[in-house]
Amino acid sequence: STPIKSSAASDVYKRQVEKKEVSFLDIELPDVHGENTKLSSVATGKVVLINFTAYMSEWSPALNMEFGDLYTRYHDKGLEIYQISLDSDLHFWKNAASNLPWACVRDPQSVYSQTAALYNVKQLPAIFILDRKGNLVKRVDDVKKLEADIKSVL
């Protein structure tokens, strides 16, 4: 796992994220084409897997393969993925993310990301699940249980 630098971001929202079923904090970051993509643009009426990641990490390819399998199986049932990269190397990230079928955005603040701090992300990868109503219902601690977690809210 990759540690995230601590920040003096909103302590109130951090406490809310620790609770179950809070509304999500919208995120708007640039995608591989430089267009800003909002989390809310993919979340309407969908179950969303939010992933804070670093493509340069050794665990990233295997995790993205797992996400690809889940996306293939459950996208037509309402699953979306919103993946936030904290990679510092823009070109590496663009090359790695350009062929992924889900929303891939990058926070140029890298490990100093205020967005990651607001979601109380202390290390990568960090995975959250939103239900169809936009409630943050799960912080995934075990990737092996990710499919069951997704199925429980689809």
Predicted ranges, named:
Residues 1-9, 13:
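Single conserved hydrophobic/aromatic residue that forms the stacking wall/gate
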Residues 11-40:
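N-terminal "domain-start" segment that seeds a small globular fold
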Residues 39-61, 67:
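Short active-site neighborhood of thiol/selenol oxidoreductases, capturing the structured segment around
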Residues 44-47, 77-79, 100-101:
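Loop/turn elements at helix/coil->beta-strand transitions in domains of secreted/extracellular proteins
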Residues 52-53, 84-87, 107:
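Active-site-proximal beta-strand/loop segments in catalytic clefts of secreted hydrolases
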Residues 61-98, 111-115:
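Structural microenvironment flanking redox-active thiols in thiol-disulfide oxidoreductases
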Residues 103-108, 140:
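Short acidic-hydrophobic, aromatic-tinged amphipathic segments that line or gate anion-handling sites
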Residues 111-153:
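Thiol/disulfide oxidoreductase modules built on the thioredoxin-like
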